[in-house]
Amino acid sequence: LCSISFDPETRRFGHQVDTLYSSEQATVQITGAEHKSASFPRVSPDGKQLVFTLSEYGNFSIWHKDADLYRIDLDSGVMHRMDEVNSDDVESYHSWSSNSRWLVFSSRRIDGLYTRPYLVHIDENGKTGKPFVLPQEDPDFYSRFMFSYNIPEFVKGKVEAEVHTIADTARKPGNRIRMEK
């Protein structure tokens, strides 16, 4: 997992690449984190922490029971397994709140089948609270709802887009970027 600077005005990447996570580093810091694939790196909006998913292999960690969340303190470079957050089943995609104090993440901890959105508070020192499933008005909602929340995201306001508009946008080609040597 590497970091490289990017200038949005010129749309150019920098030249220096910094390694944030490598399997060799993980071997030294955390037993059991060696030789795994890192995916979904997300830097907190305050720039102090980075949370990512580690799994045995590949990029679709939502299908890997071993997938867990890890955190790197970006000031010290120290990596932490998020034991308070992880369960015996999948923890995968995640998103920060705008104030860097909440994380929403996908987990299959209830039944191992469907992915549910969990929230956890993270204080300014990186200490996490106890995760909880996103509350619903009906207490039986999750036992009857047969869909997965694979990619939970925080939003600041009402989403006012029609389904067909979102689908049309998703079908459009992405923006091209250019890398120079």
Language-model features and meaning:
Residues 1-181:
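Sequence signature of WD/YWTD-type beta-propeller architectures
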